C-alpha cells in the first residue's frame, strides 16, 4: 500500500510541474517586423556566427529543380567597410543620403550564382526572404539590396561568381510603419518626423 501511495504521490508532483512555454514569435510577427532597414545601431556588432546562423535556413527552403545554385559570401568586421561605398540604400529618398554616417549595416551577405535565369531569380528571392526572417527572429534586421556595383564588388571581395544581391544586416535603429494604401495612391515610401512609412495595398486590392 505504501508503495502505491508513493507512486501516486510522485505522479501528482510530476503533473504539478510548471510547463515551459516557449514564446516564439509567429510568422505574422516576423513578417511584419521584417522591414527594409536603412539605419543600424553600430554598438551591435554582427559576427560570423550570427551570419552562419542565418544561413542555416537556406538548405531548408525550396530551390527550382533542387539545383541549389546560390553561393554566399559573408562580410563582417573590418571587411564590411569594403562594401559600404559599393551599395546604395533609399533610392526613393536621395535627399536623405542613406544610410547616415555611422549607421551602415554591421555586416553583409553577398548572394552569388554562376548560373542565371528565371529559376535562379526565384531561388534568390526565396533564400533572401528566409535569411532576413531568421535575422528578425534573432533580434536583428536587414535589407535586400539590388542597387550596387557588381563588378567592383566582385573585385573587392574576390568573388568567383557573379553577385546577384546583397543583404545588409544589423541591429535596426529606426522606426518603420506600414500604412494602408488604395489603388492609385503613391506607393513610394517616405519619412516624416523621424519615422519611415511604407504604403501597402490591402488584400482586397490584390484580388483579380
Map each language-model feature to its residues.
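Acidic, surface-exposed loops and disordered segments
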Residues: 1-208
Amino acid at each position: 500500500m505504501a508503495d502505491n501511495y508513493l507512486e501516486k504521490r510522485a505522479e501528482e508532483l510530476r503533473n504539478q510541474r510548471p510547463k515551459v512555454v516557449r514564446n516564439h514569435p509567429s510568422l505574422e510577427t516576423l513578417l511584419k517586423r521584417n522591414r527594409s532597414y536603412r539605419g543600424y545601431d553600430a554598438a551591435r556588432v554582427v559576427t560570423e556566427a550570427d551570419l552562419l546562423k542565418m544561413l542555416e535556413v537556406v538548405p531548408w527552403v525550396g530551390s527550382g529543380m533542387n539545383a541549389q545554385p546560390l553561393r554566399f559570401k559573408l562580410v563582417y568586421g573590418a571587411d564590411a567597410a569594403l562594401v559600404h561605398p559599393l551599395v546604395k540604400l533609399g533610392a526613393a529618398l536621395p535627399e536623405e543620403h542613406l544610410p547616415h554616417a555611422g549607421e551602415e549595416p554591421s555586416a553583409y551577405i553577398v548572394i552569388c550564382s554562376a548560373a542565371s535565369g528565371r529559376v535562379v531569380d526565384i531561388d534568390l528571392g526565396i533564400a533572401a526572404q528566409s535569411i532576413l526572417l531568421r535575422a528578425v527572429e534573432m533580434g536583428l534586421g536587414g535589407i535586400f539590396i539590388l542597387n550596387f556595383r557588381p563588378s567592383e564588388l566582385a573585385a573587392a571581395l574576390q568573388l568567383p561568381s557573379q553577385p546577384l544581391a546583397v543583404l545588409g544586416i544589423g541591429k535596426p535603429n529606426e522606426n518603420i510603419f506600414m500604412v494602408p494604401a488604395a489603388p492609385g495612391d503613391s506607393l513610394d515610401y517616405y519619412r516624416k518626423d523621424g519615422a519611415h512609412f511604407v504604403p501597402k495595398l490591402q488584400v482586397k486590392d490584390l484580388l483579380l
